[in-house]
Design a protein with these regions (language model features):
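Zinc-dependent deaminase catalytic domain
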Residues: 1-129
Length: 129
């Protein structure tokens, strides 16, 4: 999924899964109708959407319900995406790369969301405070 992103600095993908079915997907990139250029001089443009936000807003425009679903995402969610995840009813988040800040993880855990770090190069572990 991440390879669909036009962003050069970092490509992130997200899948929302419920009852073993993919109900939404997203990747980081510019809003619909904008040019597919995410950076200016290697700095990410402020209006670039994160993969999680794209997957969740895509769900909002569909007939699917994310209550109780699992989000699989390339990198651990930032705090802004964590807020969207909490509000969307997603109950589990699995990620493969650590983001430089962990405030999003802490917020999701505080909300009772199960957060798992799953990296094929490292031993799998559930993150808990």
């Amino acid at each position: 999924m991440a390879e669909n992103s036009y962003c050069k600095r970092r490509q992130v993908g997200a899948l929302v899964v419920k009852d073993k079915m993919i109900i939404s997907d997203g990747y980081n990139g510019t809003p619909s109708g904008f040019e597919n250029v995410c950076e200016d001089n290697n700095v990410t443009k402020p209006y670039v959407l994160h993969a999680e936000a794209n997957a969740i807003t895509k769900l909002a425009r569909s007939s699917n319900n994310s209550e109780g679903s699992t989000l699989y995402v390339t990198a651990s969610p930032c705090i802004e995406c964590a807020k969207l995840i909490i509000q969307s009813g997603i109950k589990r988040v699995v990620y493969a790369e650590k983001y430089r800040l962990d405030d999003g993880i802490k917020l999701m855990q505080r909300a009772g969301i199960k957060v798992e770090y799953l990296n094929p190069d490292e031993k799998s572990a559930s993150e808990e405070d």
